C-alpha cells in the first residue's frame, strides 16, 4: 500500500493491538469532528455516510449512530454483527433487531426506522470524536469483541444516546478476521462480556450476585459445547472465567472511574431474558422477544 497508494496515510504499529487498541491508535492521528468506524470486510453503498453525519450534526445528545447492516453473502438477510441495532437483555446478553443469538432474520423492512438502541456495531458506526475521547475511546484491554458495547454503555452513562437509522445501508462479510467458530472468539466474547458487566452494571441486585448468575449460565453453555464435542470451545469459556477472576482488581479500578458517569441511561436495555425467550419459549426474533 505504501508503494502503490501514496495518497493513503498508513500507521505502523509494533505489535497487534487488536480492534480496540488499533482503532485507538489510528483515531489519535485524526483531527475531525466525527469518526466513521468501518471494518475491513464491509461493502458500502452509495451515499451511505451523509445520513449518519446528519443525525450527529443535528442532535447534541446523540453520540453514535449505526446504519442497517446486511449480510454480504446473503444480501436479503441481516448480518450477525449489528443487524438493525444492538440491545442487551436482563442479564446483559447482547442481541440485535434482526439477529437473536444465531437466528438471523430476513430483511423485510420491518426495522426500517430511526430508533434509539443500546449499542452500535463496531463493524460500522459513526461517532462524535469529542464524546469518543471523553470516555477514553475503546478499552484496549478488550483486544476485540464487545468493545463497542462497552464504549456505548459508557457513553450512555454519560447521558448520551445511541441511534440506528435505516436510511444508510452497508453489507458485512462477517467472520472475515476471526471465524465465528474460533475458540479465540469464544474466549474473547465470554471474557469481555464479564469485563463489560463488571465495569458498567448498576442494577437492583448486587454486582457479585449478577456475576455469579452469569458465570453459572456460561458454564451451562460450556457443558453444552462439551457434549456436542467442542472441547476447545468449552475450555475457552473456562479460560475466560479465569481471566476475569485475575482481572478483578483492575476492573474494580475502572468501575470506580466510570462510576462518576452516573446518568445510567438504559434505553435499549430490556428487562426480559433473551435466553429464556429464545431457548425455552422458542421466540427467535427481536419482535417476538421485545416487541417492535
Residue ranges and their predicted role:
Residues 90-96, 101-127, 149-151, 178-180:
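A recurrent flexible, glycine/aromatic-enriched loop bordering the glycosyltransferase active site
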Residues 112-169:
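A short, conserved alpha-helix in the catalytic core of glycosyltransferases
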Residues 12-30, 40:
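Glycine-rich, basic loop-to-helix element that forms the pyrophosphate-binding segment
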Residues 35:
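Short aromatic/hydrophobic "clamp" motif used to bind/position activated sugar donors
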Amino acid at each position: 500500500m505504501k508503494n502503490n497508494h501514496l495518497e493513503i496515510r498508513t500507521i505502523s504499529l509494533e505489535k497487534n493491538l487488536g480492534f480496540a487498541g488499533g482503532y485507538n491508535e489510528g483515531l489519535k492521528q485524526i483531527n475531525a469532528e466525527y469518526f466513521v468506524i468501518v471494518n475491513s470486510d464491509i461493502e458500502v453503498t452509495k451515499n451511505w455516510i451523509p445520513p449518519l453525519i446528519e443525525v450527529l450534526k443535528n442532535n447534541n445528545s446523540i453520540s453514535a449512530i449505526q446504519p442497517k447492516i446486511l449480510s454480504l453473502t446473503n444480501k436479503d438477510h441481516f448480518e450477525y454483527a449489528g443487524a438493525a441495532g444492538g440491545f442487551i437483555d436482563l442479564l446483559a446478553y447482547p442481541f440485535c433487531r434482526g439477529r437473536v443469538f444465531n437466528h438471523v432474520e430476513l430483511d423485510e423492512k420491518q426495522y426500517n426506522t430511526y430508533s434509539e438502541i443500546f449499542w452500535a456495531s463496531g463493524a460500522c458506526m459513526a461517532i462524535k470524536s469529542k464524546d469518543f475521547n471523553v470516555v477514553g475511546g475503546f478499552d484496549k484491554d478488550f483486544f476485540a469483541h464487545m468493545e463497542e458495547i462497552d464504549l456505548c454503555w459508557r457513553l450512555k452513562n454519560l447521558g448520551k444516546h445511541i441511534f440506528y437509522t435505516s436510511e444508510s445501508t452497508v453489507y458485512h462479510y462477517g467472520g472475515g478476521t476471526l471465524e465465528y467458530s474460533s475458540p479465540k472468539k469464544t474466549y474473547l466474547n465470554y471474557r469481555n462480556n464479564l469485563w463489560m458487566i463488571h465495569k458498567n452494571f448498576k442494577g437492583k441486585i448486587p454486582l457479585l450476585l449478577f456475576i455469579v448468575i452469569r458465570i453459572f449460565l456460561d458454564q451451562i453453555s460450556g457443558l453444552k459445547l462439551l457434549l456436542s464435542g467442542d472441547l476447545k470451545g468449552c475450555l475457552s469459556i473456562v479460560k475466560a472465567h479465569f481471566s476475569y477472576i485475575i482481572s478483578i482488581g483492575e476492573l474494580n479500578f475502572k468501575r470506580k472511574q466510570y462510576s462518576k458517569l452516573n446518568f445510567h441511561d438504559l434505553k435499549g436495555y430490556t428487562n426480559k431474558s433473551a435466553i429464556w425467550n429464545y431457548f425455552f419459549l422458542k421466540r427467535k426474533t427481536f419482535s417476538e422477544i421485545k416487541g417492535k
